[in-house]
């Protein structure tokens, strides 16, 4: 029975993948995966984390003592082979000290953070990691129709009268995309990577191992095909935003009908710099990610419920005071 359940599960997954592929083929072409050289060069070594499965690469002068994703301290040396060499890299611009300072500054801007968190919270591990990204290039043809309104209010006797005009607005055009990033590591939370964007591609360099000493590099484990739905969604979202920004002068603007056709092009493989900071407080681990180029930082923080309810009570008290004044005036 367990065997049949497993086969049913595999069949359902295969059907879902086929359906997804059919949906993406309604656009034009497929994303072209880069054909990079083998990365197995002299002076390079790899580690594997038995806890989360991360595969990490570094040069022979760099000691990897723990996993930057899960904090496991028993990572195992492995054999470097069959790894695709990246096309590009953005070197680290900010130091470990910059990352620590950014984390402390991050604490200051959180009014609901427990006071003792920053005092008792200790950085267990901080590592610079080159995170693998697929960079998608292509274009999209879009034709979107909006229902827009323009409202004006005037006074007639004792009444305020609002006149609303309705307009059908159409926008069409072609939007080109260059290097739309999608992280290619299953260990890295997608929301973390989305939060620390953008990266400045003006500092993109041809890949060289010379940028690796002192840092780790994560091997990609999410293929171009598996990243394609996210890339398509980001292309469409960017296209919608570009056309929507051209519709101005209206009170409201709601898209009624849209037709977006993606033309898929070349995909490039890049390593982008991220500082990973592990902290611990009250027996719980907290992971923070900082853009190693721009300093933008994100991560989860605990909430002081005492501060939360005090903050909420303050807002409620203010609203009650305003309401009482209004009622008294009436």
Which stretches of residues belong to each language-model region?
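Residues immediately within or flanking Cys/His clusters that coordinate Zn2+
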Residues: 44-46, 64
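Short, intrinsically disordered, charge-biased short linear motifs at domain edges
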Residues: 33-40, 51-58
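Short cysteine-rich clusters marking metal-coordination/redox-active sites
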Residues: 49-52, 67-70
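N-terminal cysteine/histidine-rich coordination modules
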Residues: 1-37
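Charged, low-complexity helical/coil segments in non-catalytic cytosolic or luminal regions
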Residues: 82-280, 285
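Extended hydrophobic
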Residues: 136, 268-318
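Short, non-ligating residues that shape and space the ligands of small metal-coordination modules
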Residues: 3-6, 58-59, 76-77
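Juxtamembrane boundary at the C-terminal end of a transmembrane helix
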Residues: 322-330
